[in-house]
Structures are given as structure tokens and as C-alpha cells.
A protein has these predicted regions:
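Long, polar/Ser/Thr-enriched low-complexity segments
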Residues: 1-126
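Charged linear interaction tracts used for macromolecular binding and regulation
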Residues: 76-278
Length: 280
């Protein structure tokens, strides 16, 4: 309350009137005027940049949920990941989608970055069935035993850059839609190249030899909403690998209509009139 006195105004408590607030602090009268601020600038370029940040952040969280992320740089690993993601298609999702963990499976998206030689892989066929054919050399035919493949003999014996103690890591990425929100889930499996641990640990993919190269065969490869990546790991070092996928669910999110719908969910763009998608 404010009270009139002979020597001025006595203020006790807090007085608010319109956009003016008056209160005391340490024996002094503080007056503050509240003014309305313009909403944060959201030009087209700024909005695309912020969408990119949200895209990278959610996909990074999905990768981390599968295990430790193999990106060089230690504390700067996320920055390196974001740098590699610049090559990926721009996708636009609404505020609600990103707030609820929305993610999209992108062809070639990075899962690792390091100094070890990359593993090459591409789509192929084995006896009429779909396969992922890699650049990893193996003996032909590929020897199998009841518990799996002798990984040490198959990989280390034919590839000079593979050593006992290395691991072959398989990432499986699955694109789903939950409550109208697209989400990517990542599963990681590892096979250790050690004489006493020669079990083939990739449950859904069977190893085959194709012209002296390791190929992976399995019914799940026909699923167009999945993606795979193989990574060579040695302690804290790894190869640089991206995702092989036929998934196209991301494509509608790359359009101008998707951009405008996403922008509308954030309050629209500044610096240009907003047009409702589909209307002139």
C-alpha cells in the first residue's frame, strides 16, 4: 500500500497499477515499468535453423539411448555430430511433434565418427533374398559352427586393419508413428572379436559370404521403415558410418507445406505474410 505523508510517499508491500510496479528494497523505493516485447524474430532462415537444432537434438537423444555414441571429440562430440548432420535433408515438424520427441529416419544419417577405416555397405542379393553386402573380406564359404561364426578367423584373418579385441557394432533403426508423431528407435548390438567369444550376436541378420565379402541376410531387411549401420570399434576409436535405409517417411516433411505448417505451430514467420497451406 502507498500512504501520503508530510514528507512524501510511504510504500509498504507492493503496489501495482497498469504497467507500473512500485515496491521497497533495502529502504529504497523501486519502480518498474512493464512493457510488451515483440515476439522473438522468426524469419524463414531463422526458423529453418531452429528446426535443424530440434531435429539434431532429438535424433542425438535416440542414439544415446542405444548406448555410448561413437563420435570423436570428447566434450565436443555433439558439435561434431551436428556438423555431419548438415548434409542431411531439412525436415520440418510442428512444435508438438518436437516437444514429444519427434524424429525421422534419414538416409545416410551419421551414427559414428572416427579415424578407423570406414566399412562400405550397400544393398544386394543373396540367393534371391535381400542383403546388405559389406566391404569386409571373409573366406568363402563362410565357416559356421553351432554357436555362431568364428569372428576372429573370418574378419581378423582377412582384413589387416581388424585386430583381436575389436568389436563389430550393428545399429538397427526403426521408424514408427505414435499418436501421429513420428519416432525413431535405435537398437545397438556388438560382436567382440575374441577367440573365446565367437558367437554371432546379431539376432535378426545371418552372415553370408558374397564374392569374398561379408553379407548380412534376414527377413527384416524387407522392412522399408528400418535402417542399419555397421561400425568398427576399437576401444574409444571407431569408423565413420551412416545409415543404410529405404525409408521415405521423412519426405513429406521436407516440403514447403510442411515448413509452413510447422511455422504456424510456433506462431508463424516474421518478415513475410503467412499463407495457409493450400490457399493463395
Amino acid at each position: 500500500m502507498a500512504h501520503m505523508q508530510k514528507k512524501g510517499i510511504k510504500v509498504s508491500g507492493r503496489l501495482e497499477k497498469d504497467n507500473l510496479t512500485v515496491y521497497t528494497r533495502c529502504g529504497k523505493i523501486i519502480m518498474r515499468s512493464a512493457t510488451s516485447e515483440m515476439p522473438r524474430s522468426r524469419t524463414r532462415e531463422q526458423f529453418i535453423s531452429r528446426q535443424r537444432v530440434a531435429r539434431n537434438s532429438n535424433l542425438w537423444k535416440a542414439l544415446r539411448a542405444s548406448g555410448n555414441c561413437l563420435f570423436a571429440g570428447g566434450s565436443t562430440a555433439y558439435a561434431r555430430y551436428c556438423s555431419l548432420m548438415r548434409k542431411m535433408p531439412e525436415v520440418f515438424m510442428t512444435k508438438e511433434m518436437y516437444r514429444n520427441g519427434g524424429t525421422l529416419l534419414l538416409p545416410g544419417m551419421p551414427v559414428s565418427d572416427g579415424i578407423l577405416p570406414d566399412i562400405g555397405y550397400q544393398w544386394g542379393e543373396v540367393e534371391g533374398a535381400g542383403a546388405i553386402v559389406t566391404s569386409i573380406r571373409v573366406s568363402t564359404p563362410l565357416s559356421l559352427n553351432p554357436t555362431g561364426t568364428d569372428m576372429v578367423r573370418a574378419l581378423c584373418g582377412r582384413n589387416g586393419y581388424w585386430k583381436v579385441g575389436d568389436t563389430l557394432r550393428l545399429y538397427t533403426l526403426v521408424q514408427t508413428v505414435e499418436n501421429m508423431i513420428p519416432k525413431v528407435y535405435v537398437r545397438m548390438e556388438e560382436a567382440l572379436l575374441a577367440p573365446g567369444d565367437s558367437v554371432w550376436r546379431f539376432a535378426n541378420l545371418e552372415p553370408r559370404a558374397v564374392e569374398g565379402r561379408l553379407a548380412l541376410v534376414g527377413n527384416t531387411l524387407a522392412d522399408r521403415n528400418r535402417g542399419w549401420a555397421l561400425v568398427h570399434r576399437r576401444e574409444d576409436r571407431s569408423s565413420s558410418q551412416g545409415v543404410l535405409t529405404r525409408c521415405t517417411m521423412y519426405e513429406p516433411y521436407t516440403t514447403e507445406i510442411a515448413l509452413l505448417q510447422a511455422a504456424e505451430s510456433y506462431g508463424g514467420l516474421t518478415g513475410q505474410p503467412f499463407l495457409t497451406p493450400g490457399k493463395g
